[in-house]
Amino acid sequence: MSEFVKPYNNDPFVGNLSTPVTTSTATKLYLGNLPIYRKGLSPLLRGLEIGMAHGYFLIGPFYILGPLRNSPNALLVGLFSAFGLILILTLGLTIYGLASFQGTEGGENLESAKGWRNFTSGFSIGAFGGASVAYVLLDNISFFA
């Protein structure tokens, strides 16, 4: 087993292990295509894409596993619950940005106050939109009823 797990770049002082999963080309390709790491995206578009994905999948657990799952209003309550969680996540992103990026006003990258604000607003718009699209799809497709 020791031939599979070894220090990263054969340097034992880095504090990271090189495993077949962490150093594989497929893993690097997959992680490189995630919106947070993709080159050429503005913080607003990064937040929009991440928010759409999160909003889309957040409505399902509230709809299927929520306390009103057997009522006729389960989908609407699931939508409002997803909206509430999106508000909490947006508040958390805002607080993180205010605490982490004090005095870094300039720049359009994600590691500045302006970039993080753009990311947060894109996330909230995308998440509300993604949850709304999921609601419309679940409400209008009879397969899920």
Swiss-Prot record:
Q: Which InterPro entries match?
A: PSI_PsaL, PSI_PsaL_sf, PSI_suXI
Where does the protein end up?
Plastid, Chloroplast thylakoid membrane
Report one GO cellular component. Answer: photosystem I reaction center
Protein family membership:
Belongs to the PsaL family.
Chief location of this protein? plastid
Q: Which organism is it from?
A: Emiliania huxleyi (Coccolithophore)
Q: Which HAMAP family match?
A: PSI_PsaL
Q: Which Pfam families match?
A: PsaL
* Keyword annotations of the record: Chloroplast, Membrane, Photosynthesis, Photosystem I, Plastid, Thylakoid, Transmembrane, Transmembrane helix
Return the protein name: Photosystem I reaction center subunit XI
Q: Which residues cross the membrane?
A: 48-68, 75-95, 125-145
Gene giving rise to this polypeptide: psaL
Record membrane topology = Multi-pass membrane protein
GO BP, one annotated term: photosynthesis
